[in-house]
Amino acid sequence: MCIGRRLLTGERLKVDPSLESYSREAHKNGRIRLPRWAVAGEVAIFLFFTVFFLIYGLTPYVGGDGMGLVGADEPRYAQIAHEMLVRFDSAHTIKGRLEACVTPYLYGHPWLEKPALYYWRAMFLFKDFGVHDWSARLPSTTFAFIMIGLIYLHMRRFRPGGHLDAALITAACAGIIGFSRGASTDMQMAAPLAIGLLGWYAWYETNSKFWLYDIYFFTGLATLAKGPVAPFLAALIIVAFAALRREWRILLRTLWWPGIVLYFAMVLPWFIAVQHLNPTFFREFFLEHNLERFATDRYQHQQPFWYYLVVVALAMMPWSVLAARALIDGIQKSIAEWRLRRSCNARPGASQPGDAFPEFLVLWALIPIVFFSFSQSKLPGYILPSIPPIAILTGDYLFRCRSSGLNRWILLSHSVLCGIMTMAVLLLPRFVAPPIVSNGAAAPPLSAHALIADLGASLGAVLLILLITRGFGLARLRLATCSVLVALMLFIYGIGPIFSIPPVSATKRVIHILDRTYSARPLADLIAGLAPASETVAVFRVRRDVEFGLSFYRNREVVNYEENGVPAEQHLLVARVTGRRGADLHTASALEEYLDGRHYERVASWPEQGLEVYLVGSR
């Protein structure tokens, strides 16, 4: 019986009677046997939406690689993987190739901020597909797909009925879509950690040692992705679960010697080797980039304590309303179970392993959020491990509510949220486009007709979800919501290409605006037409993402005037001349001081990012 039926008030949706018998049969037998055609259809739905959300617009074959690397981390990590590949290919002995895979290098200098798992995976993908920004993102995409697939299989095995909802909600939430397309280490840790924790719970429920391999193997991968935070979080979640259930013996049973040997056999070789080759590794990695990053604001990522509440709400879009209700439901059910266990009138055997899944998911969801809320450095990717359990809770909650119906206000709130998200996406080009477009003319104002069209589309999204859910049942809510997301992604990335089918060029406007506004790739293409790859490129007052982006796309470190001085030879200079809302940064007067009378002339302009490109003569 759905907990929400006892806790919520208000009129509920009419439920198809067949769903009630379906749900009762599911909970009675613990497994659901669907006809083969139904299983094939379910798998087809799962694969279509999952592949679309993870792949479309990422590669040149499906939707086009519409967005270059963004932020400072993506081009930096991609460049490290590229340099590792160069060192690997240039080595002629087994020892040399192994050493090339140990120490990450950035512009020829050791970069010891993160372990090497992402660099290894990106390096070999570069070897197979070439050095591209989209191939630099494939490590995250592939791990996300494996994680979502195993969520589907795990739920189908241990929580049948809600498995497709859980998998699709995971695949179709903003946090997973975004980080699965990132050339970063966040998904490299979150996905293996999620798989490992699901494996541990499978062991807890079945008592089969086979599943214990999961927690040790995948936690080992997560450790090689981000370091000791992975086993720390896994241990903290399991210990908290044992404490809540008062089953302390499971901690001793979890300490399984074959698993421990497997974990250290995976992790220790790289950590020992990198410490041997780089004596400063322990200080730089463990002390500076782990302890100091948590305890101080040295890296200037300070945010308020409640920051991650906002991040989680945005990461779960468009499922945030349902996710919040599911999380509250899970907390209430966990409290009820805890009180039942403490009650002196509790019947023997009332607390069975199957009853513990919501408690496990709630702890898994909340512990990373609470833990990193105390960190002095806060970045959105830190709480990515909390997204899968919240999505699973949401999928399981929706399935359990099929028999009792979903509160109308919750459904309406979910639909309205999807409408608001639709409106925000449709207005996105207006928010990010500069006040002056590339030809020097002012950007046209938003017309009344365009605004009415956007409002109509948003209202259409709301009505689509309401009508489909009311007409075909709660089981179709996932399809209606995912269909809205598909339409929004087509609006952002445009239509095509699909392998040999060419794209519809008129639909690519939005992604081109985003690419020119946030990525250095179009600017690097412009510079490539102005100067050969061997010519020096310098930057002045630009953001770090521009600096690292130009370095990756040119495969050569750019010179920063403020850090390295002015090169003596002739070079191209990229300087930021305007700030937000077109504010003048008085860059020209500052350049006069740096160049000290040297001749320079403007050769290109990049208004989307407030940049100018100059040709600076030799000294």
Predicted region positions:
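Membrane-integral, polyisoprenol-dependent glycosyltransferases
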Residues: C2-G4, L8-R408, A424-V432, S500-I501, ...
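Membrane-embedded architecture of ER/inner-membrane glycosylation machinery
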Residues: D16-V39, Y213, A326-R619
